[in-house]
């Protein structure tokens, strides 16, 4: 009889299942009211006295092993049921996860930074909430200067000397105040102007402005720098500089690139001329250098600026600037391949 019980012990040890029904069959077979353990205990009275001790030990071992097996497998099955209730069927194929992407403004900004970094320009940043000195006065725009009207400004009501910057030229002022020439830096960032929101303009937009200060810097140096940029950014090798006015540069110019007239869109955006304005530039006014603590008799330089949205609209052929700020997933997910 003892040998038979040992066979049952081996069977109980070897038992394994992931099925509740089979586990219940095992429990009934070994531990049920008519199971093996109970039947074997009923035979205890017929065992010779000299074998009762060994018989009792073996049958208790069978009972313990069967109970532990039922307990262990039950816990495993309950754990899997809990995981399944929390996470679903883990064997099912996963659902498609929408991958995010960089915003088109960030893509263009980073591309501009890379282009100018290749020729030695670093990146400088500054506060979006500025004071009058850094945004206007230091840039040759003293109080009551008529050129201030060129930029409709958001002032802080409780302190009119504080405002939302209208250009990133304020960053260049701060950079010149804290760094000695030679200076070669670009200042990308968000700017604010009190303008009507339309398909072509917005009260919030992004600029990148560049500054190069050194000895014997020429207008030709500026032109070659801008020509390099337009080749890298647009693949265009023809630019022109039209005379213009900016209070912080003298002489000043508008930057045009020859876009071409290959499509109907080209005719529309260039008004039939083939030329397209992308920004402004000029030689830094000596008064600006003096205001920033740089001696204009020793150093000179050039500055330029352009709108990042303007460039993004050209490259991605986007017709409405408002699309950059509406957070429409149908628009933004078109750029996910370029993250």
Swiss-Prot record:
Query: What EC numbers are recorded for this enzyme?
Result: 6.1.1.20
**Residues that hold Mg(2+) according to the record:** 250
The cellular location(s) given in this protein's UniProt record come to: Cytoplasm
Q: Does the keyword Calcium apply?
A: no
Q: What CDD domains does the annotation carry? A: PheRS_alpha_core (cd00496)
Show the GO MF annotations.
ATP binding; magnesium ion binding; phenylalanine-tRNA ligase activity; tRNA binding
What are the GO BP annotations of this UniProt entry?
Answer: phenylalanyl-tRNA aminoacylation
Recorded hits in PANTHER family, A to Z, give: PHENYLALANINE--TRNA LIGASE, MITOCHONDRIAL, PHENYLALANYL-TRNA SYNTHETASE
Protein name according to UniProt: Phenylalanine--tRNA ligase alpha subunit
Gene symbol here is: pheS
């Amino acid at each position: 009889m003892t040998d038979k019980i040992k066979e049952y012990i081996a069977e109980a040890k070897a038992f394994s299942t992931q099925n509740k029904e089979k586990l219940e069959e095992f429990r009934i077979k070994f531990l049920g009211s008519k199971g093996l353990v109970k039947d074997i205990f009923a035979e205890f009275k017929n065992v010779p006295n000299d074998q009762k001790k060994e018989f009792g030990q073996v049958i208790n071992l069978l009972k313990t092993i069967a109970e532990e097996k039922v307990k262990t497998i039950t816990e495993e099955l309950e754990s899997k049921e809990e995981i399944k209730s929390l996470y679903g069927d883990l064997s099912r194929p996963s659902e498609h996860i929408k991958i995010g992407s960089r915003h088109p403004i960030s893509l263009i900004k980073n591309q501009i930074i890379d282009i100018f970094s290749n020729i030695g320009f670093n990146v400088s940043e500054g506060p979006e909430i500025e004071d009058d000195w850094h945004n206007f006065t230091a840039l040759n725009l003293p109080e009551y200067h008529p050129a201030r009207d060129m930029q409709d400004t958001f002032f802080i009501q409780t302190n009119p000397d504080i405002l939302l910057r209208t250009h990133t030229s304020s960053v260049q002022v701060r950079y010149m105040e804290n760094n000695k020439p030679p200076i070669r830096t670009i200042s990308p960032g968000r700017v604010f102007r009190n303008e009507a929101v339309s398909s072509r303009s917005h009260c919030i937009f992004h600029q990148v402005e560049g500054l190069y200060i050194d000895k014997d810097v020429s207008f030709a140096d500026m032109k070659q720098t801008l020509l390099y940029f337009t080749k890298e950014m647009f693949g265009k090798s023809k630019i022109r500089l039209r005379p213009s006015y900016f209070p912080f540069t003298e002489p000043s110019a508008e930057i045009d690139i020859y876009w071409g007239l290959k499509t109907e869109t080209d005719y529309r955006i260039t008004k039939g001329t083939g030329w397209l304005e992308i920004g402004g530039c000029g030689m830094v006014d000596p008064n600006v250098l003096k205001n920033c603590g740089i001696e204009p008799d020793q150093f000179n330089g050039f500055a330029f600026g352009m709108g990042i949205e303007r460039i993004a609209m050209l490259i991605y052929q986007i017709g409405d600037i408002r699309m950059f700020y509406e957070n429409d997933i149908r628009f933004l997910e078109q750029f996910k391949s370029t993250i």
